[in-house]
Amino acid sequence: MLRVYHSNRLDVLEALMEFIVERERLDDPFEPEMILVQSTGMAQWLQMTLSQKFGIAANIDFPLPASFIWDMFVRVLPEIPKESAFNKQSMSWKLMTLLPQLLEREDFTLLRHYLTDDSDKRKLFQLSSKAADLFDQYLVYRPDWLAQWETGHLVEGLGEAQAWQAPLWKALVEYTHQLGQPRWHRANLYQRFIETLESATTCPPGLPSRVFICGISALPPVYLQALQALGKHIEIHLLFTNPCRYYWGDIKDPAYLAKLLTRQRRHSFEDRELPLFRDSENAGQLFNSDGEQDVGNPLLASWGKLGRDYIYLLSDLESSQELDAFVDVTPDNLLHNIQSDILELENRAVAGVNIEEFSRSDNKRPLDPLDSSITFHVCHSPQREVEVLHDRLLAMLEEDPTLTPRDIIVMVADIDSYSPFIQAVFGSAPADRYLPYAISDRRARQSHPVLEAFISLLSLPDSRFVSEDVLALLDVPVLAARFDITEEGLRYLRQWVNESGIRWGIDDDNVRELELPATGQHTWRFGLTRMLLGYAMESAQGEWQSVLPYDESSGLIAELVGHLASLLMQLNIWRRGLAQERPLEEWLPVCRDMLNAFFLPDAETEAAMTLIEQQWQAIIAEGLGAQYGDAVPLSLLRDELAQRLDQERISQRFLAGPVNICTLMPMRSIPFKVVCLLGMNDGVYPRQLAPLGFDLMSQKPKRGDRSRRDDDRYLFLEALISAQQKLYISYIGRSIQDNSERFPSVLVQELIDYIGQSHYLPGDEALNCDESEARVKAHLTCLHTRMPFDPQNYQPGERQSYAREWLPAASQAGKAHSEFVQPLPFTLPETVPLETLQRFWAHPVRAFFQMRLQVNFRTEDSEIPDTEPFILEGLSRYQINQQLLNALVEQDDAERLFRRFRAAGDLPYGAFGEIFWETQCQEMQQLADRVIACRQPGQSMEIDLACNGVQITGWLPQVQPDGLLRWRPSLLSVAQGMQLWLEHLVYCASGGNGESRLFLRKDGEWRFPPLAAEQALHYLSQLIEGYREGMSAPLLVLPESGGAWLKTCYDAQNDAMLDDDSTLQKARTKFLQAYEGNMMVRGEGDDIWYQRLWRQLTPETMEAIVEQSQRFLLPLFRFNQS
């Protein structure tokens, strides 16, 4: 007997199942109970509730509907295989074989054009998979189409795609028969199965004694027919969560309505019959001419299409008994009001049909201002949504001591996009406000890095082996462990790979395979050769076979190079081995071999690696089962594996005890005291999934067809019904960039509208309906602040935050932050090394952070370039020019230096490197000639100088008889001049009587004349004073910007500063040009040390820079004689 139990509470239906199991024991104690479910989460919940009732839940099978129906086919009908030859995966592989054979037919012209240029069979496999997916749906929802197609006939009224789908299906059936596989599939078994059961006078052997169907929102029509036929022989209890106690489906015709009017539902607890309609006499007025019911409740009408179709299909079953197990909902708060309206099929919304109704609001229901059973929260970002949720959950737990974390479920439209924010907020909360939580339904690929690493390894034949991509593999601990590379070792390797010139490509063969010219440099083989040479010899000994040894890879940590070489050897072996197409059976052991070659599993990764191997073997087994005989490229298997790992969801922690956080998915109507919905944004939910262009079902839909949009609408309805105490909804209602308004999901808006149209706040009785509706909406919707540290979040109320870490920022109460720069007392030491002064005056602001605060913002660049050098600029060019210039000045062999740079891979390849070198040689030679012309034998001068109460000590290198001579391969800059000025003052104060010169590129020069010792000490004393001030607070000396101002305002002929308006305006322009830079030249204001002091250059800051620059830089311009 098929019995359909209707109830608005899933827990009541589950209690009914417990009652039946306890009262009607199975004859065979070893026979398992059979409970059909649609998800593992529902199975887990049922196991938990059953174990609470009986103390144990064992010997229970939880099959999915499709597998259960096929199992029944196997048990009832002879010669039916345990697995269908027409499952989706098997059909995909068979279509891979069939499609190329059919493409020359006229019906397949469109597909023939699509499959051109498909050397790797990727398009063919994707098309086969999509077609197989469609056929799989047709087997369930359109079996009559397939029956006609098998006879060679077309179905009237279908789209153009039928022209190729019909012969393709027929060919698929015939090909399956040719393979020696049964031609049976679900479409041609339903009727045979039903007829066999209908004609059987006794129960066929092997059938279960009874079957429960629990928590399934909808079943396809053919499944219901099959279950009805089974119900003739066994007990089938279909437990349906029905949000409404009255019939709210459609009808076929007046006769169907007459049949419904004669039907009664028996109350499951009381011996009485209940009608299907509230008003049976006027039931005919509920339906239009097409048989569609004007559902009384607007929310049920909008969200319930899936359930409405299912109600219709259930009512169409002939031999079934319906039982009523509805539980009255006491309308004692807003949530229960809405649930009651849906249950009773009532519409309490007052839209103001006439002026009298519109003018007052007291014909609505009053809403308690303290009622928080339904709340709407508007946030600016997913991060704020989760932060607000965490605070609100803490408030709920504080308010209700009986509430526990396991009573709360949080559902998100896309759990993968919210997981990082959930882990950041929930996972980082301190112990005093930590909420235990469990995230379910994440994609398997995001659950463990091993999965993503394995997919990357399967891409080796197509890889360019970019340095960052290879090193990223070593970020996976179990892969690094396989090659004995620790986290510290990886830091060394990252530095070595960068400095040894590795950019991309395993070796020259790999480069040629990519149809690019091989250079012999910048590949992994080139870099490894440099590292291994560095272990054997020093770079000072010269290059070996045009390769320069890399010195850093020597010593005790040199074994790292060997480990890296082992990894690269394996990568190269597998790159070659995976490149060729193979028959499927030869691909079978590849997965296990690769896992063994690249990973050293631990307890945490064992499950992930098992999942990889299971899915790989399943793909291969399906293809072999379909007897696919052609060679298969790796890319096809890789894409299929990646897709399956994306679809695989990690759900084993659902209902584990903490706050349950999961995705909104079917059959999640498990009752919870608190139901929270996040990310309910317009355009995000209901989720959009456009049907395929050749999906004939979408072109001609029928009642009972599944639609992602209808499913999501019904999910929202189920979430509302399953909430027992509170329904919490949040969405991103404001832009985080400009605070502009964004809209919620249409489902949320419909709920808000219905509440506003059916409720009013006390005191609003005299307002018209629109005004009271607006006030209700404003009352229920809480707009949260953009930032968590806003002072509003720490006032009593629904926005109150528990996050103590933001309290110091919020307690400023809107006041501006105190100034970052606060003077620190600094006492000059008795002795100051000259090197310290030089370091300070090279960049006074940076020196304050580094030397005084011990703070360094300049982290080393961790990103390794992914291309070889084509041009050299910036630091690389300066470093080469520095060595080249010194070599030319010393009149060494520049050609030897060229060979050294080329052997290290520092130069562009081939003629480009030669051209670059020649250009630099010509420019540096001009500079070197100027230096050689003035150069004399020099010696180091010891400095021990008393000035301004301190002793300056150190050495001045290369002091010539006629003074100081310095050279740099850089352009003229004030910063370079300051360094020479400091040395010049020390030199003169120590008794030197020569001049100081600094030669720079493009005829740039700084030249200072001899100064008397007293005069030099005077200026040196100023610099020491500047050092003292700069170690107490940042000294705003910006040499280039301030120097540009001084250069414009200083009149060298009259030794005066010009301050007329015209000159000051020009000086300001020059200052800003140097500070801001342009497209070609980086401005001084981009310096991170200055940006830490101020976000924007204010007039006050600019005035301070000019003042300090004039104080310390003016002597440079006054004494410069270049």
From Swiss-Prot:
Q: What is the effect of changing residue 705 to A/H?
A: Acts at variant Chi sequences
Repeat as a keyword?
A: no
Superkingdom of this entry's organism?
Bacteria
| SUPFAM superfamilies, alphabetized | P-loop containing nucleoside triphosphate hydrolases (SSF52540), Restriction endonuclease-like (SSF52980)
Which Cys pairs are S-S linked? none
The outcome of changing residue 64 to A is: Does not act at Chi
Q: Name one Pfam family in it.
A: RecC_C
User: In what way is its activity controlled?
Assistant: After reacting with DNA bearing a Chi site the holoenzyme is disassembled and loses exonuclease activity, DNA unwinding and Chi-directed DNA cleavage; RecB remains complexed with ssDNA, which may prevent holoenzyme reassembly. High levels of Mg(2+) (13 mM MgCl(2+)) or incubation with DNase allow holoenzyme reassembly, suggesting it is DNA bound to RecB that prevents reassembly.
Its GO CC terms are: exodeoxyribonuclease V complex
Keywords (alphabetical) are: ATP-binding, DNA damage, DNA repair, DNA-binding, Exonuclease, Helicase, Hydrolase, Nuclease, Nucleotide-binding
Q: What is the effect of changing residue 137 to A?
A: Acts at variant Chi sequences
Impact of changing residue 70 to A on the protein? Answer: Does not act at Chi
Q: Which InterPro entries match?
A: DExx_box_DNA_helicase_dom_sf (IPR013986), P-loop_NTPase (IPR027417), RecC (IPR006697), RecC_C (IPR041500), Restrct_endonuc-II-like (IPR011335)
Upon deletion of the gene, what happens? Decreased degradation of DNA with free ends that is unable to undergo homologous recombination, which can fortuitously lead to more efficient viral infection. Cells are deficient in DNA recombination repair and have increased sensitivity to UV light. The cultures have many inviable cells. Cells can be transformed with retron Ec48-containing plasmids.
- Other facts: In the RecBCD complex, RecB has a slow 3'-5' helicase, an exonuclease activity and loads RecA onto ssDNA, RecD has a fast 5'-3' helicase activity while RecC stimulates the ATPase and processivity of the RecB helicase and contributes to recognition of the Chi site.
Name the job this protein performs.
A helicase/nuclease that prepares dsDNA breaks (DSB) for recombinational DNA repair. Binds to DSBs and unwinds DNA via a rapid (>1 kb/second) and highly processive (>30 kb) ATP-dependent bidirectional helicase. Unwinds dsDNA until it encounters a Chi (crossover hotspot instigator, 5'-GCTGGTGG-3') sequence from the 3' direction. Cuts ssDNA a few nucleotides 3' to Chi site, by nicking one strand or switching the strand degraded (depending on the reaction conditions). The properties and activities of the enzyme are changed at Chi.
Q: Which family does it belong to?
A: Belongs to the RecC family.
HAMAP family per the record?
RecC (MF_01486)
Describe its partners and assembly state. Heterotrimer of RecB, RecC and RecD. All subunits contribute to DNA-binding. Interacts with YgbT (Cas1).
Q: What is this protein called?
A: RecBCD enzyme subunit RecC
At the highest ranks, the source species' classification is:
Bacteria, Pseudomonadati, Pseudomonadota, Gammaproteobacteria, Enterobacterales
Q: Which gene encodes it?
A: recC
